[in-house]
Amino acid sequence: MGSEMCIRDSLYPAQAVNFTAYTTARNLNKSSTSLNTQIASGSTTENWRIDYVSSGVYNIVNMSDNSYLTANETKCITSSASGNSNQQWNIIGTDKDFLGNYLYYKIVNVSTGKAITYYQKDNSIGLDQYTNDGAQKWKLNCYGLEGFAANSKMIEGEKAGTIGGLLGETVFVSDMKSMKEALLRTEPLTIVLTANIDCSGENYDWMIEDNKTIIGSYQANQMRDCKLRTNDYYGKLDPSDNIIIRNMKFQVEVNPNMLV
């Protein structure tokens, strides 16, 4: 597991996530091996990576030192990767925003069945049976998003931040065929580009389905003359939503004005 993590971290910029406590501006924060919350500051100790294990099951890794969120009886700590179920978590939506997207989630340990709980009295984090209390609900805010792409207040109410394919598996693509297949998959997905792709010979637009994150790797992040769209060509389906594109360069030569 450790070697796979190092390979991934050196290959592409993984999405950092802040877990924000219910109705606050306080983020889940690593302090030594224990946890607390702090007002959002941009510190890497507030940044977490969500690693897909299997459907609905994830490792949660602190990006300051690559330590893993770990259940220890009623305590929630960080420790080195072990591969055990006490480092595996279910992330399950609880409350939706006015658009119908999940605004809050519960985070439940696979081994204990207990949820991460914020104790405001002493600013500590522990584990307890889920009771639908606000202290057990967290926003997933992708670090770096701004404006209406991020968690924001609107006239209609509070809007959840875009998370793209955060809760799906990660696939690696290196040619037109594999990229097109990944974009059309209907489940959440992080798509990592590992080779530059020249799409100038492609005659058709490419539809991006809902819930996708497209990330360029450090070694290759360019697509040439791609024609991406989020709407149905025939106008029969609703436009796609919840899409993040990071560390990508798009070059347009053959068909100017036809990038997206």
Language model feature labels by segment:
Residues 13, 24, 31, 44, ...:
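Repetitive beta-strand solenoid architecture
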Residues 8-32, 47-74, 88-122, 137-142:
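Extracellular glycan-recognition/adhesion modules and their associated mucin-like linkers
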Residues 33-34, 39-47, 81-88, 131-135:
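Trp/Gly-enriched beta-strand/coil motifs that build multi-repeat beta-propeller-like domains
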Residues 141-190, 198-200:
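Extracellular "leader-to-stem" segments immediately downstream of a signal peptide or signal-anchor
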Residues 180-188, 197-215, 221-247, 251-260:
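Extracellular beta-strand-rich solenoid/capping regions of secreted or surface-exposed proteins
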Residues 59-61, 106-108, 192, 215, ...:
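Residues within well-ordered beta-strands of beta-sheet-rich folds
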